[in-house]
């Protein structure tokens, strides 16, 4: 009896996993041609903001790929994933370097995640670091890379990533920090925004942090070599 219940439970778990993957697959298929209105990360952020202020709202406005500054595209590629155009979702060299760096430090100080992996996490997953989440992130990344063009992946990424406390996407970020549009960002502004991506809420409050300024200068120097889809 116990053995029978075990196998039934296992079968049910497998069915639920398959259904969840199918649900993700259908969302990605829809987003090939349609723009996401929100993401898991955006919903979690809004929920946190509304705990303190029930009337809180996110700053977010979708903008088409061609209306995003080429400087911002180059800056983000240079900062987050220099091999984005060439890899298939995973930068194995980057992952190895991040692992070695984290091992030496004895804690997680580098992620090694590609733009595609970051998008997978932002669209569907929680911020908790668990083996299951990393496995699911890999599966979603694989789906994204095979169902979408690099340009589409990058367009969605630039429109849904967090750029400050309640600030999501390139258009909202450009208006929040520089009172301009995403299409009008110059080289220095783009480099500064790209430098903020790993810790946007902190840099929203510390916009003149030395680390941010130093990183922005490095990104600006690398932008000319960035390959954009």
UniProtKB/Swiss-Prot annotation:
Keywords: Cell inner membrane, Cell membrane, Cell shape, Cell wall biogenesis/degradation, Glycosyltransferase, Membrane, Peptidoglycan synthesis, Transferase, Transmembrane, Transmembrane helix. It is found in: Cell inner membrane. It catalyses: [GlcNAc-(1->4)-Mur2Ac(oyl-L-Ala-gamma-D-Glu-L-Lys-D-Ala-D-Ala)](n)-di-trans,octa-cis-undecaprenyl diphosphate + beta-D-GlcNAc-(1->4)-Mur2Ac(oyl-L-Ala-gamma-D-Glu-L-Lys-D-Ala-D-Ala)-di-trans,octa-cis-undecaprenyl diphosphate = [GlcNAc-(1->4)-Mur2Ac(oyl-L-Ala-gamma-D-Glu-L-Lys-D-Ala-D-Ala)](n+1)-di-trans,octa-cis-undecaprenyl diphosphate + di-trans,octa-cis-undecaprenyl diphosphate + H(+). The keyword Transferase applies. The keyword Phosphoprotein does not apply. GO terms for molecular function: pentosyltransferase activity; peptidoglycan glycosyltransferase activity. GO terms for cellular component: peptidoglycan-based cell wall; plasma membrane. Pathway: Cell wall biogenesis; peptidoglycan biosynthesis. It is an enzyme of class 2 (transferase). The chain crosses the membrane at residues 10-30. SUPFAM superfamilies: Lysozyme-like. Its main location: membrane. It comes from the Bacteria. Its EC number is 2.4.99.28. GO terms for biological process: cell wall organization; peptidoglycan biosynthetic process; regulation of cell shape. It is a single-pass membrane protein. Belongs to the glycosyltransferase 51 family. Peptidoglycan polymerase that catalyzes glycan chain elongation from lipid-linked precursors. This is Biosynthetic peptidoglycan transglycosylase. The gene is mtgA.
């Amino acid at each position: 009896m116990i053995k029978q219940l075990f196998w039934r439970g296992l079968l049910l778990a497998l069915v639920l996993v398959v259904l969840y993957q199918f649900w993700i697959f259908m969302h990605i298929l829809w987003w090939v041609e349609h723009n996401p209105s929100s993401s898991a990360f955006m919903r979690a952020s809004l929920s946190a903001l509304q705990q303190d202020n029930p009337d809180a709202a996110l700053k977010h406005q979708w903008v088409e790929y061609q209306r995003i500054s080429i400087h911002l595209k180059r800056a983000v590629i240079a900062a987050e994933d220099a091999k984005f155009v060439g890899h298939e979702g995973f930068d194995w060299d980057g992952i190895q370097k991040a692992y070695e760096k984290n091992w030496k430090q004895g804690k997680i100080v580098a992620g090694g995640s590609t733009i595609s992996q970051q998008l997978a996490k932002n669209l569907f997953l929680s911020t908790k670091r668990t083996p299951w989440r990393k496995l699911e992130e890999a599966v979603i990344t694989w789906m994204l890379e095979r169902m979408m063009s690099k340009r589409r992946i990058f367009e969605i990424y630039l429109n849904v990533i967090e750029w400050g406390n309640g600030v999501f996407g390139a258009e909202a970020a450009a208006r929040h920090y520089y009172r301009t549009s995403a299409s009008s960002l110059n080289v220095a502004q783009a480099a500064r925004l790209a430098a903020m991506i790993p810790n946007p809420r902190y840099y929203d409050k510390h916009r003149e942090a030395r680390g941010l300024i130093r990183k922005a200068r490095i990104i600006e120097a690398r932008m000319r070599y960035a390959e954009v889809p």
